[in-house]
Amino acid sequence: MKRMLLLAAALLVGGAAFAQRLSVATNVLDYADFGTLNVEGDVAVARRWTLTAGTKYNPFLYKADTPEPLSARQRLYAAGLRFWPWHVFSGWWLGGKVQYQEYNRGGIRSAVTDEGDRYGAGLSAGFTYMLHQHLNVSVGGGVWGGLQRYTVYSCPVCGMTEESGEKTFILPNDLTLAISYVF
């Protein structure tokens, strides 16, 4: 029994000592999507693996020269894993995650507005370049798919429903030009 406790303590302490490497990142390209705020955190759990969690938030409604406001509002939460063939926070990576998004988008190309919830999983890949011991730049892209519950309205403010329901989707995701700080 004592040996098992000693072994468990050694594994926990050894893992905790390595897991103190973490990074915090923000995707610059998301700010071009109507000012979507975003943050992502990674924790190294092994030499080639990181746990990733991120969120995006856009509460903004824009008034343009058109009678209808522009909206690209969203709340997104994601959690997943990344595999780094060489070493964490440096070089190529492959990722997988589960994701939830609540969205409201409309008035951009037409007055039609759609809102709803999306649940799904995604795959992504990219490359991280070390600028400095603590500063990285990442580029990448991916796709995600799953189930979407939605409602389509005639205009952003009128509330006239055109369509609603559930459907599956596949969308581009994680178009990334991120700046990250590694602790």
Residues covered by each model-derived region:
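Sec-dependent N-terminal signal peptides
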Residues: 4-13
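Sec/Tat signal peptide C-region and signal peptidase I cleavage site
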Residues: 13-21
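Extracytoplasmic loops and strand-loop junctions of Gram-negative outer membrane beta-barrel proteins
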Residues: 21-24, 61-64, 106-110, 158-163
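Solvent-exposed loop/turn segments connecting transmembrane beta-strands
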Residues: 23-40, 58, 66, 88
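Predominantly the C-terminal beta-signal and adjacent terminal strand-loop region
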Residues: 132-183
